[in-house]
């Protein structure tokens, strides 16, 4: 079966595109299109992995966000209060004048952890984010 390629248009900030192009060159990609296809495959694999997180888990959500963006700090606090039963701790510090780094430590049901992560990771103003999980360790 022949795979048909689709042409799409994407708008990106110039700085992000420049960094992407430099990364592609360093990694030896033959074209920007191949790099974008690889990035989309990785994104889709990560999403599929997140959908398989089930059962008791320990996890962290780490994020960098633009704290000067109107409403993001209060929105993050509101979301965290909605999931207070999962959150065991959080660490927050300022890495630049307008950017904060936060790590939220979680313990609970995998499906609820993913639900919380998706709410946070999709916020406008979140520049980098990562969900990391591991099976909950039980001592008997």
Curated annotation (Swiss-Prot):
Q: How is the cofactor bound?
A: Binds 1 nickel ion per subunit.
Q: Which GO terms describe its molecular function?
A: DNA binding; DNA-binding transcription factor activity; nickel cation binding
Question: Cofactor(s) for this protein?
Answer: Ni(2+)
* Cross-referenced InterPro entries: Acetolactate_synth/TF_NikR_C, ACT-like_dom_sf, Arc_rbn_hlx_hlx, CopG, CopG/NikR_regulator, Ni_resp_reg_NikR, Ribbon_hlx_hlx, TF_NikR_Ni-bd_C
Name the family. Belongs to the transcriptional regulatory CopG/NikR family.
Per its record, how is this protein called by name?
Putative nickel-responsive regulator 2
This protein's UniProt keywords: DNA-binding, Metal-binding, Nickel, Transcription, Transcription regulation
Q: What does this protein do?
A: Transcriptional regulator.
Q: Which Gene3D superfamilies match?
A: ACT-like. Chain A, domain 2 (3.30.70.1150), Met repressor-like (1.10.1220.10)
Binding locations of Ni(2+): 81, 92, 94, 100
UniProt entry tagged with the keyword NAD: no
- Looking at the keywords, is Transmembrane present? no
Which GO BP terms sit in this record? regulation of DNA-templated transcription; response to nickel cation
């Amino acid at each position: 079966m022949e795979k048909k390629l689709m042409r799409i248009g994407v708008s990106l900030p110039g700085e992000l595109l420049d960094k992407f192009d430099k990364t592609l060159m360093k990694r030896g990609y033959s074209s920007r299109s191949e790099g974008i296809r690889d990035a989309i495959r990785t994104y889709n694999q990560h999403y599929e992995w997140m959908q398989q997180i089930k059962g008791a888990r320990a996890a962290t959500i780490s994020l960098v966000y633009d704290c000067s963006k109107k409403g993001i700090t209060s929105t993050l606090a509101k979301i965290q209060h909605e999931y207070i039963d999962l959150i065991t701790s959080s660490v927050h510090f300022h890495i630049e004048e307008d950017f904060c780094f936060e790590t939220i430590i979680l313990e609970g049901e995998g499906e609820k952890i993913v639900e919380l992560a998706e709410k946070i990771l999709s916020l406008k103003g979140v520049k980098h984010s990562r969900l990391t999980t591991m099976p909950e360790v039980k001592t008997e």
